[in-house]
């Protein structure tokens, strides 16, 4: 197990521009140097630092079954991400982790899986999808349904992978954008409306959500209305974290620390948190 306070040196192997809109998101494929390794499971996160700039938490975006590299999908939005977006292949960064709890992949076995993601919210769910769709694990889970939403076609991340995902056995993808665009052949509308039109095996389904807070609020309410228990509706609160080890207090909600007790929570747990959340 890695020392949670000790950053490890890593090298950027590849930078992939994900979005073609003003929403600037890049995926970084990185490898730990000096024989370092980092075993993680879906839902966990990492702390990335750039000397002289700062440190910030990011959810893993790659399959936990790939040990050769780590992928992180990052939006340019602050000091650390601004500096990171200026780096090229071969540049060095520092990583420490992994931190946090995981999606309950064992409990989710023998259930159907409904994944609803908005924009960059697909990034922390990608490790879960890749884990479940992998041939070594696929038979453990039932049908996988995805509802992937973005404001515009240029805001989707991982579009190059959608066709491959759709070819996985018992897997389907519905894509939607907020407003009509020329040449778009997917859905137009908001996730909380479209999920009501989907055929969901309510008693045997786990729902996993990630996206803007307003999306999670309305989608989770719709899923509860449809009959999915709150205990089987999962999300991640990684945006609320800073230090990763429960020391800074920024992610404290009531008696819980998101970086330690989370970032993965079910809706029953969230319902017990203070109303200001």
Predicted region positions:
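A generic structural signal for well-ordered coil/turn residues at beta-strand boundaries
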Residues: 8, 24-26, 42, 54, ...
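Short Fe-S-cluster ligation motifs
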Residues: 249, 254, 265-277
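Ferredoxin-reductase
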Residues: 2-91, 150-152
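Short beta-strand element of the conserved SAM-dependent methyltransferase core
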Residues: 28-30, 95, 259
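FNR/FR-type flavoprotein reductase catalytic core
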Residues: 79-241
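Local cysteine-cluster metal-coordination motifs and their immediate loop/turn environment
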Residues: 214, 238-263
